[in-house]
UniProtKB/Swiss-Prot annotation:
Record-linked InterPro entries: ACT-like_dom_sf, ACT_dom, HD/PDEase_dom, HD_domain, NT_sf, PII_UdlTrfase/GS_AdlTrfase, UTase/UR
Gene: glnD
Pfam families (UniProt xref): GlnD_UR_UTase, HD
Cofactor: Mg(2+)
Induction remarks: Slightly up-regulated in a low ammonia medium.
Keyword annotations from UniProtKB, A to Z: Hydrolase, Magnesium, Multifunctional enzyme, Nucleotidyltransferase, Repeat, Transferase
GO cellular component, as recorded: peptidoglycan-based cell wall; plasma membrane
GO biological process: regulation of nitrogen utilization
Database matches in CDD domains: ACT_UUR-ACR-like (cd04873), HDc (cd00077), NT_GlnE_GlnD_like (cd05401)
Notes on how activity is controlled: Uridylyltransferase (UTase) activity is inhibited by glutamine, while glutamine activates uridylyl-removing (UR) activity.
Entry protein name: Bifunctional uridylyltransferase/uridylyl-removing enzyme
Superkingdom, natural source: Bacteria
C-alpha cells in the first residue's frame, strides 16, 4: 500500500472539522474566513510544491470564486483552475489526479477545471457566467506567467467585448432578481443571489473592470444608510455565520437559524437581524440599479451610433432635465441655494417613471439646504406628485432614502425604516408598506374630494410604529408637527391626525361588529366627529392600507362590509354643503365696471403668481383665458371664475414651468386676439400636447432596458350636484392634472352648450378637482352631451358618472 502523501487532504479535512468545532467560537466571521482561506491556500501551495507545480513549470493553480476573492466560506465549494501550457495528456493527467483525488477522497467539495490559457479565454468569451467567475481569478501557486496571462487576458477581453455583452448581462441580472426576489422584503432571503445580495456587488466589480463605473468611489461613499462596502461585509458576515450555524453551504437564511445568528453577531433578536439585512440589501440594490444605468450610458459608441448626436437635455421643471433616460440637474441649477430642488427632481422622476441619476442624488445630498418651516406650497405640491404617481413612487422614494434625502425631509421616518413586520399577514417592511399604501391610494384619488389628504394619510398612517406603544395613538400625535411643518392649514392638520388615529376603525368595525346595531354606526360616526369628508378619505385609505398589507387582505367580502358601514355612517352624518362661488375682491369689481379687457400679473409669496383676466363675458372666454396661460407655460394651481354685471372675472394662481412669467401686456394681446378669433388658442394647445406626446413616444427607445415607465392614473369622475335653482347645476370633474386641462375642460363645456356661471378650481399634487356651476340646455340629453364632450377631453372612459344631491 502506497504511503500517504505528506500533503494528504485527510489532514486538511481534520483541520476543517476542528476549525468548525465549538473550540473556535471566539473567531468572528472575518477571522473565520481568513483562517479558512489560509488553511486551504496553504494546502494548495504545499501540494503544488509536492507534485512539481512550480514557477516556470508550465502549470499554475488559480483560485476563482470565493477562493479568488479571498472570501472562502465554510461549506462553500473550493473553486480551482489548473492551468497548463499545452502539456500532453500523459504528463497532464498524473498532475491533475494528484491534485484532485486527495480532495475528493477527503469529501471536500471541489469545483475544478483543467485548461490552457487559450481554452479558458475561449470559454470566457462564450459563457457569461464563466467570464464573470474568471474576472475574480487569483494566482495561488506555480507558473506566475501563466496565471497573469489568464488574468490579464480575461480582463482585456472583458473590456473590449462589454459593449456586445451588456444586454445579456442586464437580462441575466433582472432574471435573477425576478427569480430570487429582494433581500429587503423576503422572510427567508437569498443572501447570495437575491436582489441586493452578494452577487450584485460582484456585478459592480465586473462593471468596474470594464471601466464603466467607479467602483472605489461608490464603495466608500458613506451615506446615512451605510456604504456599499459596509453593506457587503454585513451580508458576507451573516452568510458566514449561516454556514457555521447550519453546518451546510446555505445561501437562504431560514428562520430557524435567525436567532442564533443574531446572537452570534450581536444584533439582538431576529427582528434586529432582519432590519439590518433589509438596510444592507436596499443599499446594495440601489447601487446595483444605478451602476447598471451608469454603465449602459458609459458604453463606448461605435459605428453609425458614434455619428448620431448625443441625447438632448429635455427640460422638465425649473433646474430639472431628462438626459439619456435619467433625471438630472440642469446646467444652470444651483442646489446650494434651492431647497425645493430635491422635491422637484423627485416629482419629475415619479411623474415620468425615469430614475434619478446617481451623480444628481449625490450632489443634492451634499449641497441642498433644508426646506424652511413651514414648507412652501410648491414643495408640498411636489411631494403630493411623488405620492400620487403610483408604482413609480416606490423607486423615487427609495432613491431619496438610500442617499439620506428622504430622512431630511421626514426625520420621523427613522424609527420605521427597514422595520420588519410583527404580523405574518404583512408582506413588506413598515416603511415600504406605507409607500405601497400610497401606491394603492393613487388610483383612488378621484374617489375623494381631498386626494391630498388621502396621499398624506397613506404616507403617515403607520408613522407611530417602532416606538413600543399604540401606533395609532402616537401616530396621531406625531403627524401634528409633521403636517404643520409641511405647511398644511390647522383644519387639515386636525383632519390628518384623526385619519391616522382611526385608520383601522372601518375594517375592524366592519368585520368584528354588528352593522345592524345602531350603536355601532353611532360609535363610528361619533369617533369621526360626524365629518363626511373624513369618512370618505378614511374609506379609501382603508382599502389602500389593506391592499398594501399583502395578498388577500382586501377581499370582496371585506370590501362589501366596509362599503355597507360607510353607507350607514353617511346616512346619520350631517349633509355636506354645496360648493359656493369664491368672493371677488372689490378691486377686480371696479375693473369690471368699465367693461374693458384687463390683465394683471402680480407675485404672491414663494414662486406663485396671481394672474387676473377681466373681460366682458362671452361664450368661450374661460377656455381661451386658461389656454393663453397654458401656452405661456404657466401651470394653474387654483382658479375662480365669477360673472359680475355681464363681465367675467377670472382669477388664477399660477407658476411658470421655467424662468420668469410673461408680461401682463403680452398676455392681454394674446387674449384679445383669441377673443377676436385671430388666434385659435385651443387648437394651438391641443397641437402642442399632441406634439409633446409624439416626442415622448419617439424618445421611449432612449430609456434604458429594465427601467419601467409605469404610471398610475386614477380614473376620472364626473359628479352632478343638484342645486336649489332648477336652471343651474353644479358639476365637479376629478381627473389627473395635465398642462392646459382647465382650458380643455372649459372648452368642452362651452362646446356642449353649457354656460359657465362660476367656477372654482383646485389642484392637489397631480389631481385636479374642478367645480363648475353651469347652465345647460333644456333638452333631455343635455347632460349626456356635456359628459360626452368631457370624455373626449379626458381621453378615457369615466369611472363613475353620478347624480349626487347634496343639501345644506
Amino acid at each position: 500500500m502506497e504511503a500517504e502523501s505528506p500533503c494528504a487532504a485527510s489532514d486538511l479535512a481534520v483541520a476543517r472539522r476542528e476549525l468548525l468545532s465549538g473550540n473556535h467560537r471566539e473567531l468572528d466571521p472575518v477571522g473565520l474566513r481568513q483562517t479558512w482561506l489560509d488553511l486551504h491556500e496553504s494546502w494548495l501551495i504545499d501540494k503544488a510544491d509536492e507534485i512539481g507545480i512550480a514557477d516556470a513549470s508550465g502549470f499554475a493553480i488559480v483560485g476563482v470564486g470565493g477562493l479568488g476573492r479571498r472570501e472562502l466560506l465554510p461549506y462553500s465549494d473550493l473553486d480551482v483552475l489548473l492551468l497548463h501550457d499545452g502539456k500532453p495528456a500523459d504528463i497532464l493527467r498524473p498532475v491533475a489526479d494528484r491534485l484532485w483525488y486527495p480532495l475528493w477522497d477527503a469529501n471536500i467539495r471541489l469545483d475544478h477545471s483543467v485548461r490552457t490559457v487559450s481554452e479558458a479565454l475561449t470559454i470566457a468569451n462564450s459563457d457569461l457566467m464563466a467570464a464573470l467567475g474568471m474576472l475574480e481569478a487569483r494566482h495561488i501557486a506555480g507558473d506566475q506567467q501563466l496565471s497573469f496571462a489568464l488574468i490579464d487576458g480575461v480582463r482585456r477581453q472583458w473590456r473590449n467585448g462589454i459593449r456586445s455583452r451588456m444586454g445579456e448581462l442586464v437580462e441575466m441580472t433582472y432574471a435573477r432578481w425576478r427569480r430570487c426576489g429582494r433581500i429587503a422584503q423576503r422572510a427567508e432571503p437569498d443572501l447570495k443571489l437575491g436582489r441586493g445580495g452578494l452577487r450584485d456587488v460582484q456585478l459592480l466589480d465586473a462593471l468596474a473592470l470594464a471601466q464603466l463605473i467607479d467602483r472605489h468611489g461608490i464603495g466608500h461613499t458613506d451615506l446615512p444608510a451605510g456604504s456599499l462596502d459596509g453593506a457587503y461585509r454585513t451580508l458576507l458576515d451573516v452568510r458566514t455565520e449561516l454556514h457555521r450555524v447550519s453546518g451546510r453551504g446555505r445561501d437562504h437564511l431560514l428562520a430557524q437559524f435567525a436567532d442564533e445568528i443574531s446572537a452570534a453577531l450581536g444584533f439582538g433578536d431576529r427582528f434586529d437581524l432582519a432590519r439590518t439585512l433589509s438596510s444592507a440589501g436596499r443599499t446594495i440594490g440601489y447601487h446595483a440599479e444605478a451602476g447598471l444605468r451608469t454603465a449602459a450610458n458609459a458604453l463606448p459608441r461605435r459605428g453609425i451610433s458614434a455619428l448620431v448626436r448625443r441625447p438632448k437635455r429635455r427640460p422638465l421643471d425649473e433646474g430639472v432635465v431628462e438626459y439619456a433616460g435619467e433625471i438630472v440637474l440642469a446646467r444652470d441649477a444651483e442646489p446650494e441655494h434651492d431647497p425645493g430642488l430635491v422635491l422637484r427632481v423627485a416629482a419629475a422622476s415619479a411623474d415620468t417613471g425615469l430614475p434619478i441619476g446617481a451623480a444628481t442624488l449625490s450632489r443634492l445630498a451634499a449641497s441642498v439646504p433644508d426646506l424652511p418651516t413651514p414648507w412652501p406650497q410648491e414643495a408640498l405640491d411636489d411631494l403630493l406628485v411623488v405620492l400620487s404617481a403610483g408604482p413609480t413612487t416606490v423607486a423615487t422614494i427609495e432613491a431619496l432614502d438610500r442617499t439620506g434625502l428622504w430622512g431630511r425631509l421626514l426625520p420621523e421616518w427613522e424609527p420605521i425604516r427597514d422595520l420588519p413586520p410583527r404580523d405574518v399577514a404583512h408582506k413588506w417592511t413598515v416603511d415600504r408598506h406605507v409607500v405601497e399604501t400610497a401606491v394603492h391610494a393613487a388610483p383612488l384619488a378621484t374617489r375623494v374630494a381631498r386626494p391630498d389628504l388621502l396621499a398624506l394619510g397613506a404616507l403617515l398612517h403607520d408613522i407611530g410604529k417602532g416606538r413600543g406603544t399604540d401606533h395609532s395613538v402616537l401616530g396621531a400625535e406625531l403627524v401634528i408637527p409633521v403636517c404643520t411643518r409641511l405647511g398644511l392649514s390647522p383644519p387639515d392638520v386636525r383632519t390628518l391626525s384623526k385619519l391616522v388615529r382611526h385608520h383601522l376603525l372601518l375594517p375592524i368595525t366592519a368585520t368584528r361588529r354588528d352593522l345592524n346595531d345602531p350603536k355601532t354606526i353611532e360609535a363610528v360616526s361619533e369617533a369621526l366627529g360626524g365629518d363626511p369628508q373624513l369618512l370618505e378619505v378614511l374609506h379609501a385609505l382603508s382599502e389602500a392600507d389593506s391592499k398594501a398589507t399583502g395578498p388577500g387582505v382586501w377581499s370582496d367580502w371585506k370590501a362589501s362590509l366596509v362599503d355597507d358601514l360607510v353607507r350607514r355612517c353617511r346616512m346619520v352624518m350631517a349633509g355636506e354643503s354645496l360648493p359656493q362661488a369664491e368672493p371677488t375682491a372689490p378691486h377686480y369689481l371696479s375693473l369690471a365696471a368699465d367693461h374693458g379687457v384687463h390683465v394683471e400679473i402680480s407675485p404672491r409669496d414663494g414662486e406663485r403668481i396671481d394672474a387676473v383676466i377681466v373681460a366682458p363675458d362671452e361664450r368661450g372666454l374661460v377656455s381661451k383665458a386658461a389656454a393663453v396661460l397654458a401656452l405661456n407655460s404657466l401651470r394653474v394651481h387654483s382658479a375662480s371664475v365669477n360673472v359680475h354685471q355681464g363681465v367675467a372675472i377670472t382669477e388664477f394662481v399660477v407658476s411658470p414651468l421655467f424662468g420668469s412669467p410673461p408680461a401682463a401686456e403680452l398676455v392681454r394681446q394674446q387674449f384679445v386676439g383669441a377673443l377676436n378669433g385671430d388666434v385659435d388658442v385651443l387648437g394651438m394647445l391641443q397641437k402642442r400636447d399632441s406634439d409633446a406626446a409624439s416626442l415622448v413616444s419617439a424618445r421611449a427607445g432612449d430609456v434604458q432596458a429594465g427601467v419601467p415607465v409605469t404610471r398610475t392614473a386614477a380614473p376620472p369622475r364626473i359628479l352632478w350636484l343638484d342645486t336649489a335653482a332648477p336652471a343651474k347645476l353644479i358639476l365637479e370633474v376629478r381627473a389627473m392634472d395635465r398642462a392646459g386641462l382647465l382650458a380643455l375642460l372649459a372648452g368642452a363645456l362651452e362646446g356642449a352648450g353649457a354656460g359657465i356661471v362660476w367656477a372654482k378650481v383646485n389642484t392637489f399634487g397631480s389631481t385636479a378637482a374642478d367645480v363648475f356651476c353651469v347652465t345647460v340646455p333644456a333638452e333631455l340629453d343635455a347632460r349626456a352631451a356635456v359628459e360626452q364632450h368631457l370624455l373626449e377631453v379626458l381621453g378615457a372612459s369615466v369611472d363613475v358618472v353620478v347624480d349626487e344631491p347634496v343639501g345644506d
